Amino acid sequence: MEGKGFRHTVKAKTVVLYGKLECNVRGLVYELGWRDSMLHSSAIPHKVRNVGKEKAIYLTVCSPPGGVMGSEPLSYFQLQESGCGLVERFKGFKPSDVCDLETLDR
């Protein structure tokens, strides 16, 4: 993700499913690997990039404005990747469609 990054009015939880990511939140840089996760306010400028030698696949789940992650219905679900066609396979997914993250590779 190049440029200034993203800003939203929700809380975001990013979970790494495969590979290594560099997450930059307001200039603070964190490296996340398989099964690592990060929770932050999306109102803060943030961006993610693949820093591994292979593709990186991560899941970003956001709660609605003012909601606490896990206690409110999800308003946004996004599967993001770099280096493969996984996004095309999962376009149109809703939070209710996901019952087991391990089934994503099937």
UniProtKB/Swiss-Prot annotation:
SUPFAM superfamilies: RmlC-like cupins. InterPro entries: RmlC-like_jellyroll (IPR014710), RmlC_Cupin_sf (IPR011051). Gene3D superfamilies: Jelly Rolls. This is Uncharacterized protein AF_1581. It comes from Archaeoglobus fulgidus (strain ATCC 49558 / DSM 4304 / JCM 9628 / NBRC 100126 / VC-16).
